[in-house]
Every structure is written in C-alpha cells, then in structure tokens.
Amino acid sequence: MPQQIELRNIALQAAQPLVHGVSLTLQRGRVLALVGGSGSGKSLTCAATLGILPAGVRQTAGEILADGKPVSPCALRGIKIATIMQNPRSAFNPLHTMHTHARETCLALGKPADDATLTAAIEAVGLENAARVLKLYPFEMSGGMLQRMMIAMAVLCESPFIIADEPTTDLDVVAQARILDLLESIMQKQAPGMLLVTHDMGVVARLADDVAVMSHGKIVEQGDVETLFNVPKHAVTRSLVSAHLALYGMELAS
C-alpha cells in the first residue's frame, strides 16, 4: 500500500476555470487540513482525487501520483482511499439496511464480510446495540448516527488514506465532538493519511498536522498547523485564524 499520495498541478474547468494548479501531498500518519470558504474549490479537489467530478466539470491539467508513480483516481477509490462524505444521508441507498451497505462494501473490496467483522466496526465507532443498527434503514437514523456509520465503513475498508469532507457539518455540538473523537482515534490506531476538508479552524487546531488554504480555486498558503496559526501570511488565512481566535476573545498578533 502507498505511503504517499500527491496531487500535482490539478486544474478543473466547467464553463469557466474552477480549480487552478492545485498541488497537495498526503502522507501516512499525518492529517492535512484543506480549508477555505464555500466555493473555494475544496470539495471539487476531493472529487478529482477520487475520479467523481460532477457532470460538466472536467480535469484539464495535472496528475495524481502514489509513491511517485502516476495512478488513476479510480484505482484509488475505496481500496486506497476511503471517504467520509459531507452529507452522509446521500451516501446510503434508502432501500438497503446498514447490514447490506456494510457487507457489500466489504465484498467489493475483498474484505471479510462476516457479522462479527461488521459488528466490531460498528462498536468501534460507538454505536450501541450493533445488531439493531445493522437492521436499520438510513431514514431511521439521525445525521450523527449516519456519519458514524460512514466512519465505520471507512474502518472496514482498512484503506491507507481517508478523505473526510466536512465531516462535522450540520451536526449538533455533541455529535460533532463524537465525530472528532472517532477521527482522532482512527489516526492513533491505524495511522492513515487523512485529507480533512473543513471551514472550521477549531477542527483544524485539534486534528491537523499540516494545513493548505484555498481561495478562488487556488492554494494560497500551506504549512504546518503551528506556523499557520501563529504566523499566517495570506489575507485569507489571517481572516480565518482571526475569526477563530475571536471566538475565545483573542486577537491575532499584528
């Protein structure tokens, strides 16, 4: 399994350019946070990595490499990169139970799909009464439960990399804390490389090792999390950090 995945000079376009020459490097055991405002190109960059660009959007330049060798995004999806989506409800077929979803995911990846394996994954993400959860349909579960089920699927994949696209969006504070605890636990136990897409600098401060800031489809600043919080250089980065500090009655040093 690869130890590093690199996005090199990725450019995306629809009727007009959307993402301009984005380069990122994911490494096993490290969390890279991709931050920026809505519409900055974060989710499109993830979609390009997985080969699931929306209709009408195409990649016009750049490549993806695994351990320095060019690779197709389709060869990465699921096997080498597990995904925790922004809207978990849209990720599940409403006609299938959680047991069917989990079992089919395992079978598609050639992983063990016995009930003991599925139960262990569900218990690992803190969902009580795994036997009952496996019988549930998506519409019978809360957003927080579905997000934890998405994380359970990522655990089942045993992929060396994870893309978590706004994993705490639209969740209440308690559910957000649980999701962050789970992501932190996965990093400690499995040490995957993680691309964490978020607009929440509090999430960045807690989980990230490195940060890349996007604005208008471009990476405007990259660095380790400590440097970026203490000495942000770009105006967009300074704005994000200042807004985060203001929540605690603090100001960014001038």
Swiss-Prot record:
Its EC number is 7.2.2.11. GO terms for cellular component: plasma membrane. It holds the Pfam family ABC_tran. Keywords: ATP-binding, Cell inner membrane, Cell membrane, Ion transport, Membrane, Nickel, Nickel transport, Nucleotide-binding, Translocase, Transport. PROSITE patterns: ABC_TRANSPORTER_1, ABC_TRANSPORTER_2, NIKD. It is found in: Cell inner membrane. It comes from the Bacteria. It is an enzyme of class 7 (translocase). Gene3D superfamilies: P-loop containing nucleotide triphosphate hydrolases. It catalyses: Ni(2+)(out) + ATP + H2O = Ni(2+)(in) + ADP + phosphate + H(+). The keyword Cell inner membrane applies. SUPFAM superfamilies: P-loop containing nucleoside triphosphate hydrolases. It is a peripheral membrane protein. The keyword Ion transport applies. ATP binds at residues 36-43. One of its GO terms (molecular function) is ATP hydrolysis activity. Residues 2-241 form the ABC transporter domain. The complex is composed of two ATP-binding proteins (NikD and NikE), two transmembrane proteins (NikB and NikC) and a solute-binding protein (NikA). Belongs to the ABC transporter superfamily. Nickel importer (TC 3.A.1.5.3) family. Part of the ABC transporter complex NikABCDE involved in nickel import. Responsible for energy coupling to the transport system. This is Nickel import ATP-binding protein NikD. It comes from Escherichia coli O6:H1 (strain CFT073 / ATCC 700928 / UPEC). The lineage of its organism: Bacteria, Pseudomonadati, Pseudomonadota, Gammaproteobacteria, Enterobacterales.
